[in-house]
Amino acid sequence: MAQGFKVRDLSLAGEGRMQIEWAERHMPVLMRLRSSMGGDKPLSGVRVAACLHVTKETAVLVETLRKWGAEVYLAPSNPLSTQDEVAAALAEAGIGVFAWRGMTPEEYKWALSTVAGREPDIVIDDGADLHVLLHEEMRSVGEKVWGGTEETTTGVIRLRALEREGRLLYPVIAVNDALTKFMFDNRYGTGQSTVDGVLRATNILIAGKTVVVAGYGWVGRGIAARFRGMGAKVVVTEVDPVRALEAAMDGFTVTTMDEAASLGDVFITATGNINVIDARHMEKMKDGAILANAGHFNVEINVAALEEMSVSKRRVRRYLDEYRLPDGRRLYLIGEGRLVNLVAAEGHPSEVMDMSFSNQALAVLKIAGERGRLEKRVHRVERIQDEMVARLKLETMGVRIDSLTEEQKLYLQKWK
C-alpha cells in the first residue's frame, strides 16, 4: 500500500493549523472562491499533484482544491523551504504531503517521484521540476496528464523550451504570466520577503549600505524599491538594455557586475540565470560582503566556485555561512544560495499569494472543465480571469473604482 504522507513531526500539526487559519484570514479572494461553490464538487475524483513551497498559503490553496472534491498530493518545490508545522497540519487533515525542511537532493527527488506516482490528472508546479520529471523519467505518467499550471518565471521558461522543441505532453497554463500574479507577487511579494529574509539571516542595518541587485525584472524592481525604501544605496546590474534604462530612469545606479562587485555590501540575484555572481566577481568583493539569491534555483551564485576559492567555511548564524578567502577576507552566503525569502523567512505575504493562488485554483478548474480541448502548449491566463481576481481583491480591500459610461464606451470605438 502506498505511503499516505511523510513529514518531519506530526505533533506540530496544532501550530500549523493556527498558521493556516491566519493565512485564511488574509486571503479573502481565495476563501471567497472556495465558498462560492457551496456544496458542489467540481473537482470530484480529480487527482492533483502539486510541487509547491509548503507554506501556510499553499495549504489554503490545497485545502480549497480538496473542498472542491480533488484528491491532492503535495511535494515541496525546494528542499529547504518547507514549513514543517504546515506540512504536519496538512498530513493530519488527510492530505498526501511528502515534505520536510532540509531534504537531501535524493529525498527531494523521492518526494517528486512519489506524488507523480499517484498518476495525477492535473499538475501544479513551481519551477517546473515536476513537469520535467513527467516529461523525462516518468513520461508514461506524463502522457496521461490532462494539463498543468506553472507558478514561476523560471518554470515558464523551461516549459516554453519544451513547447518549442515540440515535446510538451499536455497543456500548461502559465499562472506566472497573469497580471494579478507577476505585477504583485513578483514585485511586492518578493520585494518585501527578500528584505525579510536578509534581515532574519543577518540582522544588519540596511540604511547606508550599498545593495547590488542583479536583474531588473518584476522581482528585481520590487527588491530594489524595498531596499531603497529602507535607506540603502541601490546598484542595479542588467543585460537587457530596456530594463537597464528603466532602472536608470527609476533613479538607480546601473553598471556591470564587474564594476559593482567591489562596491556592494549586500548582493541579491534575481535573474533566473546561471553564475550571475561568479568567481571573478567574488575575488573583488570587500571583506564582509553578504550574498543572497532571490531566483528560483540555487545557480545564480556560483557556490561551487566560492567553496573552491575558500580556505574555510563555518555556520555563523542559522541561515548564514562564512567563507574565508586566502587573503583573510570573509564572504557570507545566506541559505546556501537558495531562495532567501523562503529559506530564511516565510515567503511572500498571504495578501499577495491570495491573488496568485486564486489564479492557480481557477486554472485547475479550467483544465478540468476543458479536458481534452486545450492545445498542448503554454497558455496565458485570460484577461477576463485577471480582471475578476483584481475586482475581487479590490472589493475585499474596500476600494471602489469607476466604470465607463455608455458615452465613453462609444467614444472609444470611434476613429474621428
Curated annotation (Swiss-Prot):
Which PROSITE patterns does its entry note? ADOHCYASE_1 (PS00738), ADOHCYASE_2 (PS00739)
Q: Which residues bind NAD(+)?
A: 152-154, 186, 215-220, 238, 273, 294-296, 341
The record's InterPro entries line, in alphabetical order, gives: Adenosylhomocyst_ase-like_sf, Adenosylhomocysteinase-like, Ado_hCys_hydrolase_NAD-bd, NAD(P)-bd_dom_sf, S-Ado-L-homoCys_hydrolase_CS
NAD: present as a keyword of the record? yes
Reactions the enzyme catalyzes: S-adenosyl-L-homocysteine + H2O = L-homocysteine + adenosine
Pfam families linked: AdoHcyase, AdoHcyase_NAD
* A single cellular component GO annotation: cytosol
Chief place where the protein resides: cytoplasm
Q: Name one GO molecular function term.
A: adenosylhomocysteinase activity
Entries under NCBIfam families matching the protein = ahcY, PRK05476.2-3
What's the protein called, per UniProt?
Adenosylhomocysteinase
> What gene does this protein come from?
ahcY
